Amino acid sequence: MARQINDTFLRACRGEQTSYVPVWYMRQAGRSQPEYRALKEKYSLFEITHQPELCAYVTRLPVEQYGVDAAILYKDIMTPLPAIGVNVEIQGGIGPVIANPIRSLQDVERLGEIDPEHDVPYVFETIRLLVNEQLDVPLIGFAGAPFTLASYMIEGGPSKNYHKTKAFMYAEPKAWFALMDKLAEMTIRYVRAQIRAGASAVQIFDSWVGAVSADDYRTFIKPAMARIFAALREEGAPLIMFGVGASHLVHEWNDLPLDVIGLDWRLSIREARRQGIAKAIQGNLDPAVLLAPWDVIEERVKRILDEGMERPGYIFNLGHGIFPDVQPATLKRLTAFIHEYTSTN
């Protein structure tokens, strides 16, 4: 039987009134923590993510250290890709590198299908270990969105302008939509299995979708996203959408069957709501602010919290991941400040 959890985060996801603003941080588990860096001296990322005990330790560490209101599963967005035939290597200082980039419809057709519990069993072993024994806050599962995954698969690795991805999208629409369908199906199966293993909510990361226009999003990407969220909606867990540099796309997300829209720092919460965003909102402190003196951090955070609390359904987060040189003590102090400043008790 799962342990009793603090459900403040989940209630905020559903747009309910909460006694304080819940908080978690993207990349809260990992590179900014000395315990994690010590672990990386002994184990590779591959080894950590493939060993449930190590992965669970990294996942729960920020909950214990910072007092955040949700844990997010420590995995990489590339985790499910090898199961469908994509050769991925995480190279230090570079990121994911794909040995066999997509160049044609034939390349897409060669991709297989994922059987999550068979192909990546360590993901679900980690989830079950956390929710059954270790966590007293909700666990967030996650996956990369089709566009971001496709960008790596087509570019062969990280890109500054995604020109190969967009050229493929424009020049090979049949192959593009076939790839979106393959990745949508993979995402549905992978995330559904996370929820059924015990994840209480899910965030879909579309890290690079800000590279496309709203018109292109509607044409080339949104159909796959609508399919993903409609399928996952049946599982009953809150669904969160987040993209970087995607302020021009939040209206497209607003009519998808999801619960929470994650904002980066480029669009204020108040402005998003003024423009008609009716879902719960998560965000949106610029992570660089965490490297400033405390008085600067406090002033910026108060401004965001004041906007967020104007309506129920608000979760504090950053507008992207924590930088490696942010001090853990800053995150602990920030979490306590948010809880105290927003408490209605």
Swiss-Prot record:
Q: Which InterPro entries match?
A: UROD/MetE-like_sf, Uroporphyrinogen_deCO2ase_HemE, Uroporphyrinogen_deCOase
**PROSITE patterns, alphabetized:** UROD_1, UROD_2
Any single GO molecular-function term of the entry would be: uroporphyrinogen decarboxylase activity
According to its UniProt entry, the protein's GO biological process terms are: protoporphyrinogen IX biosynthetic process
Q: What is its EC number?
A: 4.1.1.37
Gene3D superfamilies the record matches = 3.20.20.210
Which EC class, in a word? lyase
User: Subcellular location, in the record's words?
Assistant: Cytoplasm
**Cellular component terms (Gene Ontology):** cytosol
Subunit and interaction comment: Homodimer.
Q: What name does UniProt use for this protein?
A: Uroporphyrinogen decarboxylase
Lineage of this protein's species? Bacteria, Bacillati, Bacillota, Bacilli, Bacillales
